[in-house]
From Swiss-Prot:
Its cofactor is [4Fe-4S] cluster. Homodimer. This is Phosphomethylpyrimidine synthase. Pathway: Cofactor biosynthesis; thiamine diphosphate biosynthesis. [4Fe-4S] cluster binds at C581, C584, C589. It comes from the Bacteria. Binds 1 [4Fe-4S] cluster per subunit. The cluster is coordinated with 3 cysteines and an exchangeable S-adenosyl-L-methionine. It catalyses: 5-amino-1-(5-phospho-beta-D-ribosyl)imidazole + S-adenosyl-L-methionine = 4-amino-2-methyl-5-(phosphooxymethyl)pyrimidine + CO + 5'-deoxyadenosine + formate + L-methionine + 3 H(+).
Amino acid sequence: MSTTTLTRREQRAKAQHFIDTLEGTAFPNSKRIYVTGSQHDIRVPMREIQLSPTLIGGSKDNPQFEENEAVPVYDTSGPYGDPEVAINVQQGLAKLRQPWIDARNDSEELDDRSSAYTRERLADDGLDDLRFTGLLTPKRAKAGKRVTQLHYARNGIVTPEMEFIAIRENMGRERIRSEVLRHQHPGMSFGARLPENITPEFVRDEVAAGRAIIPANINHPESEPMIIGRNFLVKVNANIGNSAVTSSIEEEVEKLVWATRWGADTVMDLSTGRYIHETREWILRNSPVPIGTVPIYQALEKVNGIAEDLTWEAFRDTLLEQAEQGVDYFTIHAGVLLRYVPMTAKRLTGIVSRGGSIMAKWCLSHHKENFLFEHFREICEICAAYDVSLSLGDGLRPGSIQDANDEAQFSELHTLGELTKIAWEYDVQVMIEGPGHVPMHMIQRNMTEELEHCHEAPFYTLGPLTTDIAPGYDHFTSGIGAAMIGWFGCAMLCYVTPKEHLGLPNKEDVKQGLITYKIAAHAADLAKGHPGAQIRDNAMSKARFEFRWEDQFNLALDPFTARAWHDETLPQESGKVAHFCSMCGPKFCSMKISQEVRDYAAAQTIEVGMADMSENFRAKGGEIYLKREEV
C-alpha cells in the first residue's frame, strides 16, 4: 500500500491527467471481442484471454505443443476496454441504446427541463467551466405510455436490451470445446432457476415476474444492458462520490472509469458535496454501466443540510432532475416508518443508514409519516415515465452484529415488500436493499425473509459484514458475508472498501473493494452452479499444473498484482518458465512432484503393457505369423 500523500491540488492534477490521456486499454494478453445478436447493432462486448500452448512432448530441438483455447469472460469496462475505440471524456460515450429507444416510438423529447433546480443551474453562467458541454435533450414517456423494461416484458416483448443480456450472461461459453474446461461441479442453488443456456425469452420471463431488473433509463443511452436477478450471474456495485471535504469532478470520473475496469456492474454516485448536479452529468455521459443515486442526499443539500426542512416538493424536483439526467436507479428510503423509529432505541448502534437517519429525523421532528411512503405512488409515476428502477433502501439496517435481524430491520423489510407490489402496479422495476452487519449463522434468514416477504424481487446487500473487529479490513469481513448471501440468492453485492468506517475511498481502495467482491460474487456463482462459472477456474488450474506462469497471471482477476508478487522473488525471465515458485523451491514443489509421479505412472503402464504383450507372444509359441483362427 502506497504511503505517499498528495496534496489536494496534486490529486486533482493527477486525475485530470488520467482523463486527458485516457485510451481504450485491454488487460494483458486479452483482446476485446464482440458477439453479435439478431440485428447488426446488438454487439455484446467480452474479454477473451489468450493462452499459450502446453508442451506435451518431443525433444528440445523439436518440441510438441497442444493449443489451449482462449477463455472468454464477462467485461464491464465498455469502450474503455477496447483499444480500437477513441476515448474523449469531454464528448462522452457513444449512445449505444439510442436507436432501440427511438424505434419503440413511445417517448418524446422535452421542450424544457421539468426540474426547476436544473433550469436554475443551466442559467448560471458561473458554472460554465464545470458543466459537461454535450448535454442531451431529455426524453420522457409519451402521454399514456410506460417505457420500462418491465412493461415490455409483461406485454410479451423481447427488447434488444434483453437479447443483449442473454448473450452477455452466457459469457461466450458456447465457444469452449475442451471437456477439461467445461467440467463443472453441481451446485446448490437454494431454489434458484439456472438454465443451461440463457435465452432472450428467459430474460423476458424473469423481468416480467419481477425476479430480475434491467436498470436502463431512456436518458442514459450510453449504458450497456445488464441484469440483476438471482437466476443470473451475481453482480457487484461500486460506490463513488464526492463529499463536502474531499474529491472533485475529475477524480470521480477517474474513479468511474477505474471501477468499470475492475468489474463494477453498476456504480452509485453518492456525492454529498458541491456541484452534485454537474458531477453526475459527467459521470452519466461517460458511464457504460447503470448509475444509481440516493436522491435524498441532494434534496438535503437543497435545504442546507437541515433534515427538518425537507419537503415532498423539493424531493420530487430532485427525482425529475436526476431522471432527466439519466440516473438508472434510485435508492428510496420509503420503508422507514414513524412507528418503526422507536424500535431502534434499544439498539447498540441505532440508525446507521444516512438516508434512514435523515428520514427518521424528519418523521420525529414533524411527528408525521415518512413523506416518501406517503407519496410513493407519485414516485412510481415518475419512475415509469423514464424507466428508473427503484432500489428500496434499508434505512433501518443493522450497523453492528449485535443489532442484526432485529424487529426494526425486519419490520422495514416487510414494508418494502408491500411497496414492491405498489411499484409493480406502475410497471416499475424494483430491487430490495439489505444489510449490513450480520454474523455468518444469521445471514441465510435475511435471504429467506426477503424472498418470502418481497415476492422474489432481487436482493441487493451491503456485505454483510460478519464481524465488527477489523477496521481497515472490512472488505474482508464483508466479503465473507457477501459470498454467503450471494450463494443463498442475493442478486447484487454492494462492495465495501478498506476505508469503510474510516474515510472516503480513493482509487486504490475502489480497486481493492472490487477485487474482493468479484471474488465473493464468483464464489457464489460456483456454489449456485451457474453454467460456465467454472471455466476460468479450470483454465487457471490447468495453467498452474503445467507451470504456464504467464497464463496464470493473465487469468487472474488482477494480473498485475499476481505478476508483481511472483516477480518479487523470481524476477528473471527464467522464472516465468520455471517448474516451481519461491514458496517451495525446485525440489519441494508439489505440482512438479505430481507431474513426475504421473509421468512415472504412465511409463510403468507402458512397461507393464509391453511385458504382458511379450508373455502373450511367448504363450502363443513365439511365431511371428499365426493362422487366422489363432488370432
